Design a protein with these regions (language model features):
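Beta-propeller blade signature
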Residues: 2-5, 45-47
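Serine-hydrolase catalytic core recognition
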Residues: 11-13, 20-226
Length: 226
């Protein structure tokens, strides 16, 4: 909350997470549901005037995940092409993974400039985890050129959609393999739909030394028809 003069900034949702709120009819109270990609949802009742927590109403139960050995995605951060900028992404691995083995990597790519695409909230069912169960390390990355960061970060894609943040993505995956030897840097593929399909084809055409295979679905391969 903030005053019309730009002063007195006050957070009414202090818990770390991505928040969704719903006000009561009187607007005196609101429900605050928050989560992270690796933290399940919590719902609290708060007072609108100051954000005071009144009650914890619900916490998601992850016991069934633990029973089958599935873990939420891991958040991983590495430096981008400039050596300074943090590049964020997530990693899913098989529930029965063996750290002594090597696993091929699949990148779920979508580098459209109109948003950021790595999920910020908890996802109870994950396509990435389903693919990981087939024996892959599956990753999703927001490289330079995606939105919701600084203007300089976003402007990388200006009149340069083909960039797609590949320099950052490749560095990120290489950093992941340095931390986790079970990540096989010699077997990296990717897949995507729409802009992600275009990105997949671009990866194979312009970065074949790194990306060895790809599946492009409904790719917008000629931006002149957009």
């Amino acid at each position: 909350r903030i005053s019309f003069d730009g002063k007195h900034l006050q957070s009414l949702t202090p818990d770390k997470g991505n928040h969704e709120i719903a006000f009561s009819p009187s607007k005196k109270y609101f429900l605050d549901t928050y989560s992270l990609v690796n933290v399940p949802p919590v719902t609290k009742l708060r007072r609108s005037s100051d954000g005071q927590e009144i009650a914890v109403l619900e916490k998601a139960d992850l016991s069934i995940y633990k029973q089958v050995g599935v873990s939420p995605p891991e958040v991983f951060v590495a430096k981008g092409r400039d050596g300074l900028t943090d590049i964020w992404g997530i990693v899913s691995k098989p529930s029965d993974y063996d750290p002594q083995k090597k696993y091929p990597v699949l990148e779920n790519i979508y580098a459209g400039p109109h948003d950021s695409f790595v999920p910020k909230s908890f996802v109870p069912y994950s396509e990435m985890q389903s693919l990981a169960e087939l024996g892959f390390i599956v990753v999703m990355i927001d490289g330079m050129g995606t939105a919701n960061r600084s203007k300089d970060f976003h402007d990388v894609c200006w009149k340069n959609i083909a960039d797609a943040g590949f320099e950052d993505r490749i560095l990120w995956i290489k950093a992941l393999s340095k931390k986790y030897p079970y990540v096989d840097i010699e077997r990296v593929g990717l897949y995507g739909t729409s802009a992600g399909g275009q990105n997949t084809l671009s990866a194979l055409l312009f970065h074949p030394e790194f990306y060895k295979a790809g599946v492009a679905a409904c790719g917008c391969h000629d931006n002149r028809v957009d």
